[in-house]
Amino acid sequence: MITGKITCLHITDVRFPTSLDQHGSDAMHTDPDYSAAYVVIETDAADGLKGHGLTFTLGKGTEVVVCAVRALSRHVIGKALEDIVNNFRDFYRQLTSDGQLRWIGPEKGAVQLATAAVLNAVWDLWAKKEKKPLWKLLVDMDPHQLVSCIDFRYITDALTEEEALKILQNGKQGQRDREEHMLTSGYPAYTTSCAWLGYSDEQLKKLCSDALKEGWTRFKVKVGADLKDDIRRCELIRDMIGPDNIMMLDANQRWDVQEAISWVKDLAKYKPLWIEEPTSPDDILGHATISKELSPVNIGVATGEQCHNRVMFKQFLQAKALQYLQIDSCRLGSVNENLSVLLMAKKFNVPVCPHAGGVGLCELVQHLILFDYICVSGSLDNRMCEYVDHLHEHFTYPVIINRAAYMPPKDPGYSTEMKEESVLQYQFPDGAVWKKLILEKKVEV
């Protein structure tokens, strides 16, 4: 029995000054401060367990998401956890379909980021109650229960509830072997940490060299600011990693459609597997055009980290606008909405390669991609999960990478709990770190 009624919801603006060292920098986001709207929910249960959740931001604007979380809290406080998880679809719709709040969405923007933070905390608490890591909670669920967590509204022309159920039932075959394979070998990862756009050549060379020694074979390179510089950097990195290792490119929405096609063709000689976010994340038809034009040079299109909701993913898939689908554990409406996208990707036979470039994203998305392999896709072909080597030390249960692979978490929960001292030090603007930076005028407020 899942005990406890939610009695309070705490929300904190937590920011890390990553812009000072250009960590996370790309063609569009030149000075990001990796940040989170961090949620903690408490119940009246005797076990004292708490649910921890977050959504990822880049600094300024986190306060907007914090306000949105507070606006959603009235749908959460006073609810029994058992009632939520036994009617999860209804609870999800309560959060996303508030008759007034949905006007500033619906299911997109700051209000959807806030929804993810709240629901991530609920899922974390549920998994802790069941004494399982989140991925194992999902793997052990009956297909009917999994389907009951999903809101199929607006996507039944691409995936019906019956089709989703059949996919999950078929996924039971070989499930135990796949789970054992993950426990032994882990889920393949690629690194983005070597080639942020703001890094010097010396940094690139050292980081690539270190990564190769650690066993990394898949590398992502940020591009899009200057073509000549991109050519130089791609040549440097291709020379460093050799002809047999995999390179991907990421433009972070920098180009118009025709510009993207021309620019990427000029980089084709470096044999990138994909170009990520070549244009506006909302331009589905633009992505489709780019996909068609780059197909002859064997470069796929990857996108999804700023895809607002399952409806957009539906359209990307229907339009054949992406070859690699990148879910995000905090952009979509938490586990619930990600489940629907994983199932659509399976139906359309498109590999899922999650986005994880942000604080806490590696910790969260590892659970989703493990579930995808074990219960949905059943395949590792053309599949990998992003890894960035930043800020894991601030989490109670940090991600574990071994031989360039995500090793399945064993601790109960969604791996979302941050260390209390980190929250105190980095809360904005009153944490000790930020007070010092503001006093020294190293940052603008």
From Swiss-Prot:
Write the Enzyme Commission number(s) for this entry. 4.2.1.68
Q: Which reaction does it catalyse?
A: L-fuconate = 2-dehydro-3-deoxy-L-fuconate + H2O
Residue sites binding Mg(2+) per the record: 250, 276, 305
Which residue positions are annotated as catalytic? 222, 355
| Principal location class | mitochondrion
Of the GO CC terms on this record, one is:
mitochondrion
EC category name? lyase
Q: Which Pfam families match?
A: MR_MLE_C, MR_MLE_N
- Cofactor list: Mg(2+)
- Which amino acid positions bind substrate, per UniProt? 24-26, 34, 220, 252, 276, 305, 355-357, 386
- SUPFAM superfamilies (UniProt xref): Enolase C-terminal domain-like, Enolase N-terminal domain-like
Q: Name one GO biological process term.
A: carbohydrate catabolic process
CDD domains linked to this entry: rTSbeta_L-fuconate_dehydratase (cd03324)
Cofactor: bound how, per the entry note?
Binds 1 Mg(2+) ion per subunit.
| InterPro entries linked | Enolase-like_C_sf, Enolase-like_N, Enolase_C-like, L-fuconate_dehydratase, Mandelate_racemase_C, Mandelate_racemase_N_dom, RHMD-like
Provide any one GO MF term from the record. hydro-lyase activity
UniProt keywords (A-Z) are: Isomerase, Lyase, Magnesium, Metal-binding, Mitochondrion
Q: Where can this protein be found?
A: Mitochondrion
Family to which this protein belongs: Belongs to the mandelate racemase/muconate lactonizing enzyme family. ENOSF1 subfamily.
Q: Which purpose does this protein serve, as stated in its record? A: Plays a role in the catabolism of L-fucose, a sugar that is part of the carbohydrates that are attached to cellular glycoproteins. Catalyzes the dehydration of L-fuconate to 2-keto-3-deoxy-L-fuconate by the abstraction of the 2-proton to generate an enediolate intermediate that is stabilized by the magnesium ion. May down-regulate thymidylate synthase activity, possibly already at the RNA level, by promoting the degradation of TYMS mRNA via an antisense RNA-based mechanism.
- Could you tell me what this protein is called? Mitochondrial enolase superfamily member 1
Taxonomic source organism: Xenopus laevis (African clawed frog)
Task: Supply the gene name.
Answer: enosf1
